[in-house]
Structure formats: structure tokens, C-alpha cells
Regions:
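Catalytic alpha/beta core of large soluble enzyme barrels
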Residues: 35, 178-258, 286
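N-terminal cofactor/phosphate-binding cores enriched in small/glycine residues
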Residues: 1-51, 55, 59
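Conserved phosphate/anionic-ligand binding catalytic regions in large, soluble enzymes, centered on
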Residues: 7, 14-16, 41, 118, ...
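Catalytic alpha/large subunits of respiratory electron-transfer oxidoreductases
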Residues: 34-35, 115, 149, 178
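Secondary-structure capping and boundary motifs in well-ordered enzyme cores
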Residues: 2, 14-17, 21, 41, ...
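Residue patterns forming the tRNA-binding/recognition surfaces of aminoacyl-tRNA synthetases
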Residues: 54-171, 225-383, 388-398, 404-407
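Short acidic, glycine-rich loop/turn motifs
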Residues: 164-168, 191, 205-210, 377-379, ...
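Short, conserved helix/loop micro-motifs enriched in His/Cys and acidic residues
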Residues: 1-11, 96, 101, 221, ...
Length: 421
């Protein structure tokens, strides 16, 4: 099967090289009297396609919101019909000996039915669930992204040292993101750090707010980094999220979906973008004599691969695929030799991935793609099924049902062998 290229563009040299190798193998096996199907198709490319069409509409003075979901989908189908043929024409010009009679598009009706069936199967087996967790959030697209869709780029920035005052003085906390202090719920120190033992269990004043937050002890804190004091923002940092769960802290979300500060921030900072808020917060800290200095620092900035936008850790309810058991099964196949890596040294990378794997966020807040086959009753109870009729029949539901608005990314199904054209 040709890994389906996106309908958003045209083939590049990599595609040409890949398809030439596959064509050679296909023709060779046919000459050896094998029955060969070389499957061809294109990918609907949810995020990329939606972005292209939104930019086209922007030039016409329209937005997807102004059109509504149904009309926006029609615009995408029109664009797909116009652009999608570019790739297939290129493949034909290459002379690729694919079976054109079986050409597929990942939004074809039979493919969508298969995707829904697999979602239901995984849900029934307890492998798909819905839960609140931190995600990589793109404020431009206003959707969650998986780690694979994140580009971590090293950029020059600063570390700011901020004073958190208490009854007998202050703690100095080092941070690369002073704007997130508005969502701080604690200052953490290492339980073995003698400098701060007497302060554990007491409170400090959160700068620029009227809140006080506790000083807690956690082994995660590195005594040798900075001052050994760590600001804990459970709703806006992946490591802090885990600390927050351990200490039962409140998860205070200070962001709107568009990346501006919300009503949980002091009024002065509300509706500001994060970098705008950073500038003002640093000025305010300095004026209040709460800024203890800064120093240049290089750090990895997570950006969305498609938009280049700085991503925010964002607490939201999403659909997830449990990966631990799948990772264990995949690792067994490599260890017993049923799956082999060439060259063999890639096994080490593979096992590292499998060991540190997290549950995969598969839902996206998009208007193009495979819609999640889930419905909700008036009490927000969720029902999963291939259709509303099936949900009603299986669960004996007679009241109003509302379809889940979100879409999901089933690309991993092909890689796992769960879905074939």
C-alpha cells in the first residue's frame, strides 16, 4: 500500500523515490507469478486541509464559523475535488503500476464505516476512554494535538527570578514562564532541602494577586537547579500536573481556547495573549520589587507543526487510546523476533518509546475528518455506537441524543494493522 499522501499538495522527491522502489518490488513479484495488489489512495489530512480551506475563505472575507459546519464541509469537498486530482495525476505520470480500480480516499463512505466500527470495538474493549488531562493545545487552530504533531525548537529566552513573600521573608522562584504564575497553586521544595524545611506546610503570597498558596514538599524538585524552589501550575505544565495530582491541588485554568487569559486571571490581564501578558507581568513584578533578576537561557519551545504557533499545556476533556498494553504486545513481537528492525540498533529507540509511552489523545476539535461515533443523553451520559439507531436499540434510549461534536485521528489504526483498505 502506498502510504496515502495528503490531498493538500503535490508529490515531492521523497514520494517519487519511495514509489519507484515499491513499483520495482510490485512488478518483480508479478513477474514471479504472485497475485499482487498495490493499493493506491489519498489521505483527507484533517488539520492540513482545514487550514488550507480556512485561509482560502479568509481571502473571501469568510470564516468557518460564519458558514457553519455543514457549509464548511461542502467547501472542503469542493476544494478536495479541485486539488486532490493533482497527486493521482502525478502518480499516473510516474507510471506507477497500482490498481487504479481500487483507489481509495480516507473519507470514502466504506472507509468511514470501518473507522467507526474500529472505534466502537476499541471502546467496548476498554481501550478508548474520555478523560480530563493536559494536552498540547494550539490556540490558533483551537484543537488538541498529539506529541507527533509538535515541533520542539530551541530558542533564546530568559529565566526570571521572582519573589514569593511570606511572614519572615520571601522564597525566590526561577521560571521561564512568568505569565503562568497567575495559575500557581503551590511552591514546591525538595523534602530533603534543609534550607526550606521550616517553611513546608506554610503559605506564601502569590505575586500580583490576592491569593496565598502552600509550600509543599515533593521529590521531583531538583535542589541544585536555581534556588531549589519550583512554582507549581497544575493546569498549565505537564510535570506540575502530576505534582498537583499527588498533592490534591486545585487545577486552575487561566486560559481561553484562543490562548488569551480568562476570568480566572486578575482583571488587568484578562483577554491578553500569553506573550503580551508576560511583558506586562514582568513590568509589574519589577515595579512591586518582586523581580529578583533575570538571565539569558535557551529552551525548547513547543510549536504546532502546521501553524508554527506556540502550544500551551491546556486542561480539557478529550478522548484517549490506552497504549500500555498495546506497547507491551508490540515489544513482545520484537523480542521474539517476529518483527525485526533493520538496522538492529533501532530496537533500542523502539523500546525506549514503548517504555515511556503515554495514552494517546485521539480527539481533535476540527470540522473535517472522521466524527467520533458517540452520543449524549440529557444527563451527559455517553453512548458509543456506529449510528444513533444502533445506540438507541442497544441501550433502549428513547430521549433526546446529541452527537459528539469532535473528530478523531484514526491514522494509528493502519500502523497497528487494525484497519486496512
Amino acid at each position: 500500500m502506498i502510504p496515502p499522501p495528503n490531498v493538500t499538495g503535490s508529490l515531492h522527491m521523497g514520494h517519487g523515490f519511495q514509489n519507484t522502489l515499491m513499483d520495482i518490488m510490485t512488478r518483480l513479484k508479478r513477474m514471479q507469478q504472485y497475485d499482487v495488489l498495490w493499493q493506491v489512495g489519498t489521505d483527507h489530512a484533517g488539520i492540513a486541509t482545514q487550514l488550507v480551506v480556512e485561509r482560502k475563505l479568509e481571502g473571501e472575507g469568510k470564516t468557518r464559523e460564519s458558514l457553519g459546519r455543514s457549509k464548511f464541509e461542502k467547501e472542503i469537498w469542493k476544494w478536495k475535488k479541485y486539488s486532490g486530482n493533482t497527486i493521482t495525476k502525478q502518480l499516473r505520470r510516474l507510471g506507477s503500476s497500482v490498481d487504479w480500480s481500487s483507489e481509495k480516499f480516507t473519507m470514502d463512505a466504506d472507509f468511514s464505516d470501518a473507522v467507526s466500527e474500529v472505534f466502537c470495538k476499541l471502546y467496548d474493549e476498554g481501550l478508548i476512554y474520555k478523560g480530563y488531562r493536559l494536552v498540547n493545545w494550539d490556540p490558533s487552530l483551537q484543537t488538541a494535538l498529539s506529541d507527533l504533531e509538535v515541533s520542539n525548537e530551541e530558542e533564546s529566552s530568559f529565566i526570571w527570578n521572582i519573589k514569593y513573600e511570606h511572614d519572615s521573608g520571601h522564597l525566590t522562584v526561577a521560571t521561564t514562564r512568568p505569565e503562568t504564575l497567575l495559575g500557581d497553586m503551590a511552591v514546591a521544595v525538595n523534602p530533603n532541602d534543609k534550607r526550606y524545611k521550616k517553611l513546608i506546610g506554610k503559605t506564601v503570597k502569590l505575586p500580583l494577586t490576592d491569593r496565598e498558596i502552600p509550600v509543599i514538599a515533593d521529590d521531583y524538585v531538583d535542589m541544585s537547579f536555581g534556588t531549589g524552589c519550583l512554582k507549581v501550575t497544575p493546569a498549565h505544565d505537564f510535570n506540575d500536573f502530576e505534582i498537583g495530582k499527588r498533592h490534591k491541588l486545585e487545577f486552575l485554568n487561566i486560559l481561553n481556547k484562543d490562548g488569551t487569559l480568562n476570568e480566572n486571571a486578575p482583571k488587568k490581564y484578562q483577554n491578553l495573549k500569553m506573550l503580551e501578558a508576560r511583558k506586562i507581568i514582568i513590568e509589574d513584578l519589577d515595579q512591586a520589587n518582586l523581580l529578583a533578576g533575570s538571565e539569558k537561557h535557551k529552551l525548547a519551545i513547543p510549536r504546532g507543526e502546521r501553524t508554527g504557533e506556540i502550544l500551551e499545556p491546556y486542561l480539557t476533556e478529550q478522548w484517549y487510546l490506552k497504549t500500555k498494553n498495546l506497547a507491551q504486545e508490540a515489544s513482545k513481537l520484537v523480542r521474539n523476533g517476529k518483527v525485526q528492525f533493520v538496522p538492529k540498533n533501532w530496537e533500542k529507540t523502539f523500546f525506549n518509546w514503548m517504555k515511556d509511552i503515554e495514552d494517546w489523545c485521539i480527539s481533535r476539535q476540527l470540522w473535517w475528518g472522521h466524527r467520533i461515533p458517540a452520543w449524549y443523553d440529557e444527563n451527559k451520559k455517553v453512548y458509543v455506537g456506529k449510528s444513533e439507531a444502533e445506540v438507541r436499540k442497544r441501550n433502549k434510549v428513547s430521549g433526546t441524543l446529541t452527537r459528539d461534536e469532535e473528530y478523531w485521528i484514526p491514522g494509528f489504526l493502519r500502523n497497528c494493522g487494525l484497519l486496512r483498505p
